[in-house]
């Protein structure tokens, strides 16, 4: 899809790069010549990912809790020492659990907000201040949720991801003079390693209501992410990749 050397001499950080969409994004960046760092909380999944990604190019892994600024600072130190620069940041790390809004505990709410919103911001701020401001260039792509029509059962994550999307619009203007672009990718239901975390009946119901009658793939999300990462005149946008689902019908049953 892209020229094989498109990302030669580019350094990329993918959070949540050990599995699913993040893994595929890392793989495609490697395929097109980038030096890639992947980061995640789970060491064993990172180790497996490094083995699987090795045939595609040079990848380095770092155990990272995006909720902890000290951990992020150590990662930035490693990238600065080993590579001296960072060109592209992919904020893919996140997590949530299905629950009726009224049943979410204070701790449950804070855990999702701290990961999906605060963690995304902590990583973005550190990498921008450490690298992008110094270089007067940089590309940030956030992987968010397709919550265009709301996301019943995921109110905590819907709130956090909406915050990330508005943050992207704000930073796109605030940092435009520094040569930084900031965009979001909002996938619909994707056939990935996280799909089994949702009730099977919910998954089947949603699949039947997608105009294209299928789930998206990690490869398709990665292709869009790479496109936004290399685009120079697109910033502040949230691009939906959901098979047309947001323009057709309703996914959610009202009880």
Question: Which role does the model predict for each range below?
Answer:
Residues 100-101, 105-113, 195, 206:
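Substrate-binding pocket helix/loop in short-chain dehydrogenase/reductase
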Residues 141-163, 168-177:
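Catalytic loop of short-chain dehydrogenase/reductase
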Residues 214-241, 246-247:
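C-terminal substrate-recognition "lid" of short-chain dehydrogenase/reductases
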Residues 18-20:
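Conserved glycine-rich cofactor-binding loop
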Residues 29, 85, 165-168, 172-191, ...:
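Conserved Rossmann-fold SDR core element
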Residues 92-97, 244:
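Conserved NAD(P)H cofactor-binding loop of Rossmann-fold oxidoreductase domains
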Residues 10, 58, 85-86, 100, ...:
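Active-site loop of short-chain dehydrogenase/reductase
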